[in-house]
């Protein structure tokens, strides 16, 4: 026997559009029954999306085959993240998006370098050993003393006086000399500035502007010198790769192209990098007073005997 149910379906509650939802008191904004509910996401939750990318970057950096470059990059990334967190604890969405893109770019590059990509290895070495990026600017700051170069360009030049603009430190002039010997740059700053001074003798203000422009165009082209411990470490690493050291030839990851072999890829990358960088000769125990005290990333004071370097370059000419 069939039982016919007499229960009728209830119609859904249709509230008027102007009826206020109880969540309005909790969220602090007007919410109606007709409006779409979007819970506001706190900024610290938005920043928490960067944590997995940051851990991925540090994990890939620790797996990098060069231990010194790995240590430099990890300390740099940690200092950069600490500084960004202190300077702006509640960043904007655009800034968070920019950080996310930076983390993805560096993480993907180092992961490709771990897999044996020659271009990624070369870019990672350049960034780690201060050939590009903020570490390069820090090393140039050590090379060029702020006391020597004035903050403002003078509007007039004194008459009958040798003018060499800009006011380059002796250490940076030695770096220019070595770059010219290695065919990294074609002309020294003094040659460019002397020609500009001869052309514009009657217009001293234009001399200063043109010399400053020439200096700003020439400075990014020079190869920043390596520190002594970095130079010897890279050469010892190249020797280990050439002799097929088991610690280097058997990494915990497989290269992209197993036919070439990981040792050949590393050897090619190191030779390409060392041929493009500059090394400044130095005397670890100078007899006279040291000219420059250069603080490295590992708090090692490097004392350079710049006078001998300049005398040798003058004799060669």
UniProtKB/Swiss-Prot annotation:
Full protein name: Uncharacterized protein C17G9.13c
Pfam families to which the protein is assigned, alphabetical: LYRM2-like (PF20263)
Any single Gene Ontology cellular-component annotation: mitochondrion
Organism expressing this protein natively: Schizosaccharomyces pombe (strain 972 / ATCC 24843) (Fission yeast)
Single Gene Ontology BP annotation: mitochondrial gene expression
């Amino acid at each position: 026997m069939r039982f016919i149910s007499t229960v009728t379906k209830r119609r859904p509650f249709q509230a008027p559009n102007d009826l206020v939802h109880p969540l309005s008191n909790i969220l602090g904004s007007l919410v109606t029954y007709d409006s779409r509910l979007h819970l506001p996401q706190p900024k610290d939750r938005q920043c928490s999306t960067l944590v997995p990318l940051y851990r991925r970057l540090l994990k890939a950096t620790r797996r990098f085959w060069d231990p010194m470059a790995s240590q430099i990059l990890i300390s740099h990334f940690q200092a950069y993240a600490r500084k960004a967190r202190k300077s702006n604890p509640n960043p904007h969405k655009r800034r968070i998006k920019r950080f996310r893109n930076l983390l993805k770019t560096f993480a993907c590059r180092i992961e490709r370098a771990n897999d044996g990509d020659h271009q990624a290895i070369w870019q990672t070495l350049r960034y780690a050993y201060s050939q590009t990026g903020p570490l390069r600017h820090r090393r140039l700051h050590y090379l060029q003393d702020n006391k020597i170069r004035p903050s403002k360009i003078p509007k007039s030049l004194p008459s009958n006086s040798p003018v060499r603009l800009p006011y380059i430190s002796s250490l940076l002039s030695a770096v220019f000399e070595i770059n010219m010997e290695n065919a990294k740059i074609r002309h020294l700053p003094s040659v460019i500035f002397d020609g500009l001074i001869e052309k514009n003798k009657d217009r001293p203000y234009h001399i200063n502007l043109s010399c400053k422009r020439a200096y700003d165009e020439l400075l990014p082209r020079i190869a920043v010198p390596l520190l002594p411990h970095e130079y010897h470490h890279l050469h010892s690493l190249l020797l280990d790769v050439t002799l097929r050291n088991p610690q280097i030839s058997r990494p915990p990851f497989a290269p992209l192209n197993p036919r070439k072999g990981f040792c050949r890829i590393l050897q090619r990358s190191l030779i390409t990098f060392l041929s493009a960088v500059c090394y400044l000769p130095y005397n670890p125990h100078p007899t006279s007073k040291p000219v420059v005290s250069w603080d490295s990333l590992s708090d090692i004071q490097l004392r350079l005997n710049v006078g001998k370097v300049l005398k040798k370059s003058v004799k060669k000419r």
